A protein has these predicted regions:
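Cytosolic/matrix-facing juxtamembrane and C-terminal tails of multi-pass cellular membrane proteins
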Residues: 479-485, 503-508, 524-554, 565-579, ...
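Long, hydrophobic alpha-helical segments that serve as membrane-spanning/inserting helices
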Residues: 1-38, 42, 50, 71-74, ...
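C-terminal functional regions that serve as terminal interaction/effector modules
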Residues: 472-483, 491, 691, 695
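Alpha-helical transmembrane segments and their membrane-interface boundaries
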Residues: 1-136, 140-170, 302, 317-475, ...
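Hydrophobic core segments of alpha-helical transmembrane domains
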Residues: 72, 116-119, 161-201, 506-519, ...
Length: 701
């Protein structure tokens, strides 16, 4: 199944930024999720028509719809936490608030503005807090409509939670059949991403592969750590999977060294790394026997019959530091997969902090997140103003479904869902198409059980659309909601017409009240994020090129890397490297988000692109130098490294204070730092060229 992408001719008809907004991402259909979506929504609808209790079935379907729209996959317990928290602390209280303010006029207007502010504050607590805040707002607003009139009031929340429980029940069989499949898949994806990145070395796709690897590592650590936390202990299988994941840091360092030198690896090597991923995915673990040092074990490979092939270690194909480090990583991973490893002996755990201490630390952390900064509070103000304008319009204008106007404003302005402008455009276009589709369905399909057929199709397409484009989500979500609401108030195609009018008005409110008057909304936010990434790179440089070699020399008399134990947990250097690459990945994501803005904003963002690329080259050069030092090359002087980091930190300070960056004196000429110095020089040449652009808060020209 493929949803059509925006044709190439669109770019010649509409502005480039608009073509980017409309173009869907590539994604494979998630068949399992699509099937669960049908069952989660279709079964309550079938019960509604069979029993005549339309209101209870609607609430159950609403609970299922929440689960479908916020389920982003991953480990079972992570999904349960996300869905249950959003339902119990967001959706259900929201419905109760809606029933309390239903029909109360200006009191309801004030209440929904307050809820919008609370929703924005909750979004600062991270992923689960973000979706919980959004559901609180959505279901409070839905309570202003027909849902708020349902009595008794507790039926509303109870029916909704039953739908959530039904949706959670649908994802449970997969967990019971294979409890660790999500974690194994996440770790396997890291090795698939490594193989893809090595294939793309020296090509334009190399940067995207680096970003994909950073994302895969983040997802894998989240999955494995969540599994360990839910298991309540360090089981042997969990520790083994963590050891497999830890080896990926050795692969990542070797890959960065190869990227920095532009050295490619033979296809056989990347094929074997793919086979490592297959071995992890199929749990070819300690009982599988020794994996092949030059011989195959197992039956056909991927796509063949029998057991999957197990990887072998190819002979040395190059004597470069990067190639040797990559082969050593393959040897270590083979030992971990074959069971020839032992968990590192950890010192006795210190006495755990008291409950009072833990509660105090948690309270401080949450308080810091909630306080935020100026931009965060400005956004909360924008959301509350737009919600207030929409709520006032819903009171004074003769709208058939006035609560939809408020609801759409909140969804478009969701603080951490990307470009507000792009979402307004996508929402508008998607709702036009979706409203027409809903009108056609209501006009052609007779009311009754026959509606189950289009309802099931729309429910199946919703998860697929979610993976591709926000506008596509609205194409299928709009008629879906129209059909659900029509269960309570049979209005036919006029319901779709009202939905269209409300969405157009909401998009206008967002663009005219919540976007155009606020300079921070249409300015590129790349400078501050770039400065933060510069500091993360400097922290990695100082640890990897100064502190780590010094510690090795003090301990062994040599800066050479000691032989790593297979599955050894990553040290501070690896954690700082991962943090820096994650920051670079987030910087790229912010750049892509800004490119979806109109030309006045995206043009300023484009000017930052050479600096982003140059900073990625600095990271690769540092990692390549680290690998070379570990193989016995000369250690750079600490003073030279500190000179480079001082220069980069001064540039970060200049960017944050909107002043032209100044380079004090020449860069160090240490031969051991030649590649790093050249990469830093590239960053400086981009940032200091027409430095007034930086002082004006836009971008390097």
């Amino acid at each position: 199944m493929r949803l059509a992408s925006v044709p190439d001719w669109v770019s010649g008809v509409v502005p480039e930024w608009l073509a980017k907004v409309m173009r869907p991402k590539k994604a494979a259909p998630p068949w399992g999720t699509m099937a669960r979506a049908v069952l989660a929504l279709w079964v309550p609808m079938a019960v509604a028509f069979a029993t005549g209790r339309r209101e209870l079935a609607l609430l159950t379907a609403m609970g299922g719809l929440l689960s479908v729209t916020i389920d982003s996959g991953g480990p079972y317990w992570q999904r349960v936490e996300r869905i249950a928290t959003a339902a119990v602390l967001g959706g259900a209280p929201g419905l109760l608030i809606g029933t309390l303010i239903y029909g109360r006029g200006w009191i309801a207007v004030s209440a929904v503005v307050f809820v919008a502010g609370v929703s924005s504050v909750l979004a600062r607590l991270g992923g689960v807090g973000s979706v919980t805040g959004l559901q609180l707002f959505i279901y409070s607003t839905l309570g202003l409509g027909p849902l708020g009139a349902l009595r008794p009031w507790w039926h509303t929340a109870l029916g909704f939670l039953v739908g959530v429980a039904w949706a959670l029940l649908l994802i449970t069989p997969g967990y019971l059949l294979s409890p660790r499949s999500a974690e194994r898949k996440a770790v396997a994806e890291v090795y698939y991403a490594l193989a893809t990145g090595l294939r793309l070395t020296g090509t334009p796709g190399m940067a995207g592969a680096r970003t994909a690897l950073a994302g895969a590592l983040n997802a894998a650590y989240d999955a494995v750590l969540t599994r360990q936390a839910s298991a309540g202990g360090r089981s042997a299988r969990n520790m083994h999977l963590m050891a497999v994941l830890n080896v990926s840091h050795q692969f990542a360092e070797a890959a960065a060294a190869l990227r920095a030198t532009g050295e490619t690896v033979p296809p056989l090597v990347t094929e074997e790394i793919d086979l490592f991923g297959d071995a992890i995915l199929n749990e070819r673990g300690p009982t599988a026997g020794a994996l092949g040092f030059g011989e195959r074990r197992g039956g056909g490979g991927r796509g063949g019959s029998g057991e999957p092939q197990l990887p072998l270690i190819p002979p040395v194909w190059s004597t470069s530091p990067g190639a040797l480090a990559l082969r050593e990583s393959m040897v270590n991973l083979t030992r971990v997969l074959s069971g020839k490893w032992a968990p590192a002996i950890t010192p006795p755990a210190a006495e755990p902090p008291s409950l009072r201490s833990r509660m105090r630390d948690s309270a401080l952390r949450v308080t810091e997140q909630l306080i935020g900064g100026r931009i965060v509070w400005e956004f909360t103000l924008r959301l509350m103003i737009c919600t207030g304008v929409a709520a006032i319009m819903s009171e004074v204008l003769p709208l058939q479904r006035s609560y939809w106007l408020v609801l759409t404003v909140g969804i478009i302005l969701k603080p951490d869902y990307g470009s507000v402008f792009a979402r307004a455009v996508q929402r508008g276009i998607g709702t036009v198409i979706g409203a027409v589709l809903g009108a056609v369905i209501l006009a052609l399909v007779p009311y009754g059980p026959w509606l189950l057929l289009p309802f099931g199709v729309l429910a199946a397409l919703l998860p697929y659309a979610k993976a591709r484009n926000f506008g596509l989500v609205t194409v299928f979500l709009t008629p879906l909601v129209v059909l659900l609401i029509d269960l309570l108030d049979v209005a036919g195609w006029h319901l779709a017409e009202a939905r269209l009018v409300d969405t157009v008005l909401a998009s206008a409110v967002v663009l005219l009240v919540g976007y155009a008057p606020w300079p921070s909304a249409w300015q590129a936010h790349l400078p501050g994020q770039f400065a933060g990434t510069l500091r993360a790179v400097c922290a990695y440089m100082e640890q990897a090129l100064v502190a780590m070699p010094a510690a090795r020399i003090a301990a062994t008399g040599s800066a050479r890397s000691p032989k790593r134990a297979p599955g050894e947990a990553p040290g501070l250097r690896s954690r700082l490297r991962r943090r820096a690459y994650r920051s670079l990945s987030n910087l790229r994501a912010e750049f892509q988000r800004t490119m979806a803005e109109p030309a006045a904003v995206s043009r300023r963002a484009t000017a930052w692109w050479p600096a982003v690329v140059a900073l990625e080259e600095v990271m690769d050069a540092v990692t390549a130098t680290v690998v070379a030092i570990g193989r016995g090359t000369t250690v750079p002087s600490a003073s030279s490294v500190h000179a480079l980091t001082r220069t980069l930190k001064a540039v970060a300070d200049a960017i944050e204070t909107s002043t032209p960056p100044q380079v004090a004196g020449p860069l160090p000429g240490d031969p051991a730092l030649e590649a790093v110095t050249a990469a830093v020089r590239s960053v400086l040449s981009v940032l200091t060229r027409d430095a007034l652009a930086v002082s004006q808060g836009d971008a390097p020209a």
